[in-house]
Every structure is written in C-alpha cells, then in structure tokens.
Swiss-Prot record:
Organism of origin: Arabidopsis thaliana (Mouse-ear cress)
UniProt protein name: Probable 3-ketoacyl-CoA synthase 21
FAE domain boundaries: 42-333
Gene Ontology molecular function, alphabetical: fatty acid elongase activity
Topological relation to the membrane, as annotated: Single-pass membrane protein
Keywords of the record: Acyltransferase, Membrane, Transferase, Transmembrane, Transmembrane helix
Stated family: Belongs to the thiolase-like superfamily. Chalcone/stilbene synthases family.
GO process annotations (BP): fatty acid biosynthetic process
Amino acid sequence: MNQTIHRVSPISMSISELTTLLSSGVSVFEIFAGLLVVHLIYQRIRTRVKVYLLDFTCYRAPDSNRVPMSTLIETIYLDDKLDQESIDFQARILERSWLSNQTSIPRSLMEIPLKKSLSSVKIETMTTIFTSVEDLLRKNKLSPRSIDILITNCSLHSPSPSLSAMVINKFHMRSNIKSFNLSGMGCAAGILSVNLANDLLQAHRGSLALIVSTEALNTHWYIGKDRSMLLTNCLFRMGAAAVLMSSNDHDRDNAKYELLHVVRKNKAKDDRAYRCIYQDIDSDEKQGVSITKDVISVAGDMLKMNLTSLGPLVLPYLEQFQYVIQHILCKKLKIYESNSSYTPNFKTAFEHFCIHTGGRAVIQAMEMNLKLTKVDIEPSKMTLHRFGNTSSSSIWYALSYLEAKRRMKKGDRVLQIAFGSGFKCNSAVWRCIRKVEPNTENKWLDFIDSYPVDVPDSTNIRPG
C-alpha cells in the first residue's frame, strides 16, 4: 500500500495537544517560549553554515631548482634515450608554451641521467608540502593542534602511509583529526578539496580545515618517445599550496573570502573524455601520462556543462533572461546560426577570474569562450609564465597574483575554475569580505612590480 509522507515542522502542534498541555497546568507563555526556543534551534540547524577562507600560501622553490629553457633543452638533447624527432617536438612545445626561465623542477630531474626513485619523490613532496604548511601556520600564528580537518591531494603520488598521515606525523597534529588523502583526481583536485572541506565544515560547525594541494613531478616525468606523453614534461612544474578554511562565525573578521558556490562536473562515463588524460605505458613499457588531441574539445564541452549549472546561481536575472530568449530563437525558431548562439556575460557576475594554468591553449580557450579581456586572463597567464603548470595548486597562485597587485576589494567576486583527468571541470565562487593587502609571505611580492610582462607567442631556444 502506498503511503503519503508529510513533512511537518518541529514546532507544529495540534489543537488537542495544545489543550492537553494547558489542562496540565503549563501556561501559554511557557508553551510559546518553548516553541520559540525549538524554532530558533531548528533555524540554526537548517540554515546554511557560512564557510570562510582565512588565508593561503603558495610554494616558491629556491633558485637552485630553477630550470631555464636553455638548461632544459640541453638536458633533453643529452638524453640518449630520445631520438631527434622527440627532441624537436619538445623544443617546439617549449618555444610556444608561454613558460619563462624562472620555473622550477626537482633537483633529481636535473641530473643526467634523470634520477627517478621513491626516495626522490618523497623528498620532493615533503619539501613542497612541509614548506607550504609551515609558512601558513607561522603566518597565522596557529598551532598544528588547532586543525580539525586535514585534506591533502596529489594526483600521481599515493604512498603508504598517505600524504595526510605524513603531515600529521610531521606537525604532531591531534589524534582525532579528520584526515583525507585524495589521489588520481588530476588538476581539478584543488577545487574538489575545497568542496570536500566545505561539506565537512558544514557538518562540523566551528571547525578549522587545512587543505594541501601539490603534484609530484618525479613520479610522472616521462623518459620515452611517445609525443602525447612528452607534453607533461614540457608544461608541469614544481608547486604547492596550503589553504586554511573555517566555519566558525568568530573567524569572519579575520577571513579574506566567503565561499558562495562550488560546482563540480564529471564526464568519466564517456570513453573519449575518460581517456583524453590517461596514465599508461607506451610501446616500450615506459610509464607516462598521455594527453590526447581531444583534451581541448572535451574541456570545452565540460566548461559549457559547468557554466550551465553555475549561471543560474551567479548571473543577474536580466542576463539569464537574455540567454533564455536567445536560446529559444536559436534552437526553436532557427533565426540564428548555431555558431553565433548567445554566450552569457559572466563578467556581470565576477570581477576576477583564476583559471587553471593547464597550458597556453587552455587559457586562450577560456578567453575566447567567456569573452574575457587581457586583464581578465592576466593572473593565469602570468602564473603560467612565472611558475608553469603547478597542477591543482595553480588557481591559488593566480589568486595570490591578484592579492599582490592589490586588486581584491571588499565585495569583489572571484571565479576559480579548473580542469582535470576523468574528465572533470570544477568551479568555486568566492566573495572578498575585506580589502586584501599582500603580506611578506606572498610569493609574488619580490617581483610583482615587474608584472605583467609581455609574453611572446614563440621564442627560439634550440641551439645552433
């Protein structure tokens, strides 16, 4: 038999129940006072808990890890495992990559021959993670034992014990800390971690969460000849970020941003999307991460999917109305050609954009699809130029750039958007709740006055 389930408010009461209470000697005032208390408790429970971004830091490698283009191309030329065709291919990619001579890689990858080992990757991850966390805790005068939730993410290095356990061990965190380690989630894992932290902070009100995002280059540095796998060597560089979030109302005055929305989209059910970024072995049994030519078109599809869900949450009603009308005219009445369909103006919803620095093609595609200006893409373009593709932490380098430039004002809204293997497209929306001034821990501060710089579309780095 079908039964209808009725949802009732916790403060609802029938006439008979009220009569029973009154006849038992309870006053009307006491009844309504009790109902008011229950109502306030209910409202507090059901009301969305506000989650704040207190602070974050990015990792900046020492100059000894700097890899100028000339050094990198020389290392490639001296690698006897590569043929001339593979060497020329990497040189062409590097020349058009927008990367500068200031990006960094682990010391183990500068040796000839390259030194790939478990001990090397452990040194790399400990260096980036520990330095980022130490900087963040020192900057905010926090004890490691004050952290309630810990989330680490690193796509291609998943040791046992986990990276989160490594952090707990290093900083002697509490035994009851809620810790999570995410692996294999690609460059979109930074926002994914924010989403997980948000859910946990909503459930555990008043808690403090620490997110650490990084990638291990030593693990996936490719030493074969497959072109699709050589791309990662050309684009990925050393980096990490540590992020501090809170759901404690008392932290609002010290917070920089409030989290408004997180939208996550995944297309792993589609084989083409699933395999466009794929860890595999080549014909010579060499392990690497393959990036196929489908990645740009898949990313474009995923971007549309994400923005379709994000739009109604952030766009002004007029902008949404214009989109609906144009969509009807385009699809139903066929007045417009399909390639001239209306694209909502997301600049009406955001003052700033932090795009994942997946590469030159990713940033240019975002610029075209969202009709962004050179100023809009400047934080991501300069991040790619100065630090390279630092994977899941790249969106924090871009936000750090905006802070160093003193562009973040109270009330400003910023969109962080990232793509990752799977295939995923994740976005996070933050609102600045006070004017943000850069401090001494900002890794851009020493040279921010020289930015933005003119980034040539192509440079010649090949000898001879």
